[in-house]
Amino acid sequence: MAAVLMVHAAVAQADTTADTIAPDDHGAYLSVAFGNGRIYGGNASGYRWMRGRTFEVRAGRQQDEVFGLALPSGWTMRVDFVHYNEGHPDNNHRDGFALQWLAVHRFSPMWTGELGAGPYLSMNTTEIATPTGNTQIDDARLGVLLSAGLRLAVPGPSGTHVRLGYNHVAMHTVHRSDALVLGIGRQFGAAEPAPDVVPDGRLWLGGTFGTSITNMAGTHGAHAGVLEARQYAERWGIGYKFLFEGDDGARVDRRGLAGQLWYVQPVTPRLSMSAGLGPYVAANRRDGNRTATNLLISFQAERALSARTRAIVNFNRIKTFRKTNDRDLFQIGLLRRF
């Protein structure tokens, strides 16, 4: 949550250059919302409400055409990268990442509606019965996230609004969920990196430091560090990371090398959001140095401090797909151009 709050603070203090540009014109979209909901069906048991700990973070890009075809007046389309947490009902703590396509309709200068759908890769920390007793697992599944939203424009920078959202998760053989969330968002105008801070073509080196949390009981948080090399090419980037995840005292003390493909969305001339995905090969010292290939998913905010320096804050999810030892890293650091 620290990473979420830092990103939200960065947005609130972002450059005002984009304010003079009309929103909904290929600009970035950012929102954060909190709420409550309920699970049902499948493996749902015990107390099924989410205990008021539901939240979502959205980062997207608005489009006014689909496959080169202009949309009707008042309509736009948006593609969102979503981190969604379904709260804490009994024996189920599910969260994950979705890629959503949304149809957006402006009813009036004050009111805007949204409908969206897309694949949702989830990770559920739960206990299952085994011959030796109950065993805690990280259950990875692919489902669908369906969303509807109603936005009300509020005073502030252009595009700022309050957003009331409804989310439905459908997933085969396991529980489904419904939730209402309320938060604040902003549709930014079109933006490109300022000429003096365009990152393309150069090699960037840097490091981040923060904490890591193993998504299993009986562990504690640890200090974690990452060394990174990256190159940008307009909206895309390629990065390589060496991760030191830290020792949780019981299950995980991993370190290894990851490669990621990034999509970069400018928010203002000096602020951008990006999402990265790629393989992560690591050895776990608490498992006899056994080496395995995992998936590294990252969500990052970058602020250009100068032509050669960028401040970054990110959230990283390490997914093992072995039903155990998934991990979250929250990091802050710097990239330097060479």
Regions found by a protein language model. Give the residues of each.
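N-terminal signal peptide c-region/cleavage motif recognized by signal peptidases
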Residues: 7-9
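Short glycine/proline- and aromatic-enriched beta-strand/turn motifs that initiate or cap beta-hairpins
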Residues: 12-76, 80-86, 177-237, 241-244, ...
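Residues that define the transmembrane beta-barrel architecture of outer-membrane proteins
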Residues: 26, 49-57, 91-99, 140-146, ...
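Sequence/structural signature of outer-membrane beta-barrel proteins
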Residues: 35-44, 80-90, 120-129, 167-173, ...
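Extended, hydrophobic interaction surfaces within ordered domains
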Residues: 49-53, 58, 65, 73, ...
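Residue-level signature of outer-membrane beta-barrel architecture
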Residues: 59-63, 103-105, 152-154, 168, ...
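Repeated loop/turn-to-beta-strand initiation elements of outer-membrane beta-barrel proteins
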Residues: 65-77, 109-113, 154-164, 190-195, ...
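Outer membrane beta-barrel transmembrane domains
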Residues: 120-140, 144-145, 149-151, 249, ...
